[in-house]
């Protein structure tokens, strides 16, 4: 008998999610069972964990399992567990809302294309809502462990925007979900069909999944039998686990629909005993860049589930890695706070980090195509590595990929090792340029002398690149050198001597230009880096780079006041023309225009663009 029944509306995001699930995932209907079994498994994990400190939660029933029953007459499938269960408040919160951060942003990414959307929804994890792919009504009966039988609840919805919830006496703890199947989904009333789905997706679940036994004639008996392997897969030796088993376990722990790119499974013995199973996903999760989103590994202690998203076992730049740590020596009552200062955790973290970097190095060496797929998804995150992880800086540096002037493509596919192997004879530096975009970097006037001499330059246009080169200042004994900061020394003594001679000759012109630009520049110098452009702006060796200044200003940060150096090309026709201008106003117009042109060529912004346009127009008229 249901009492105190109420009708409530779903959260807006849930309505959208239900619509998307039903319409985008209908071609892979069977995943509903995987999702509901996965939820039941989580409920059993949580009960066992909480019962460590409160044994009464077992209520004299510690035989934990998941049960699946089919009723052909009523056209229903019931998935039940004797796990932690739900209270009234938890049912409303967990079944009526989506508590995940970034839900709105996620939904805004959906395109209406079924193939793309099903992949996105898969990586978001639809969980309970997948029931509505096959059912036109879902009934949930549940009672949280430790509450009275009278506190049992019954929740029901047709997936049409609202649900009812009320109290109903339930003598046993746990959750029972009954799916009232749509007529076209009667295939799921077949015992063998359900067993096949369990074998395909949920064989690795470490809790027993039981169904009624079948007689030789195919009839149900009253006895139940376990229909999955019911072992903690990661505790087995590699030789006992198939590739398909590894992939299905990954999908279970990650809620991802795609196979992982690779994985590493290790049993460590010695002073500390633990098992790690680490996966590299094939695509980035939708919340990879959301700072509040948690990314971590599942932690078990002696096969007992302790927590999801334990962030202490990998540095943040490896937050895309999914997997399991099962430690034998950590206390069962360990908390997130204790994990922070635990020596064994530090040891496992160091080992996991090296394991992931080793996996990636192996992939980069043996399967360049797959590694490029990885880089396209996670390269930006990996670039955070040298900034965060000094100890592994060299290993990470080998994994980085860049666009260069030699590759001729925006695709980042050149390693630093490849760059070094192609260096010119006598070249002792790795040259790079940072800019706000690939096109800005590729077309920078700073590249002119390097193109002429055939010297390769890294083209860095990701925001993180500015920080990266600040922390990673050399590779393989070669210093990383910005071509837009300080002087460029290319070992050309003849050019250096020529510049010195020209400086003496052009000293009056340089002084005149300085007097015009005055406070806008730190200095005016002759350049040896330009062949085609009249001028460029560079940062002083000791100053913050111009692109870094722009990034910090855009973020609202205070930036130390630093002025650029204005370098002029004495061989360019426009600079030669300055010699002949007698009128001070005309001279000022030309110099200011050349300076502002150089700022724009470097991707900079002008305080007054209208003034620049007027200046150019006046010069065009007077030419």
UniProtKB/Swiss-Prot annotation:
Q: Which GO terms describe its cellular component?
A: cytoplasm
What residue spans carry the region label C?
A: 551-623
Sorted alphabetically, the keyword list is:
ATP-binding, Chaperone, Cytoplasm, Nucleotide-binding, Stress response
Q: Name one GO molecular function term.
A: unfolded protein binding
PROSITE patterns, from UniProt? HSP90
The residues the entry assigns to the signal sequence are none
Q: Which Gene3D superfamilies match?
A: 3.30.230.80, 3.40.50.11260, Heat shock protein 90, C-terminal domain, Histidine kinase-like ATPase, C-terminal domain
Region spans: A: 1-336
Annotated compartments: Cytoplasm
InterPro entries named in the record: HATPase_C_sf (IPR036890), Heat_shock_protein_90_CS (IPR019805), HSP90_C (IPR037196), Hsp90_fam (IPR001404), Hsp90_N (IPR020575), Ribosomal_Su5_D2-typ_SF (IPR020568)
Give the source's domain of life in one word.
Bacteria
The family note in this entry says: Belongs to the heat shock protein 90 family.
Q: How does it assemble?
A: Homodimer.
What is this protein's name? Chaperone protein HtpG
Q: What is the lineage of its organism?
A: Bacteria, Pseudomonadati, Pseudomonadota, Gammaproteobacteria, Legionellales
Gene behind the chain = htpG
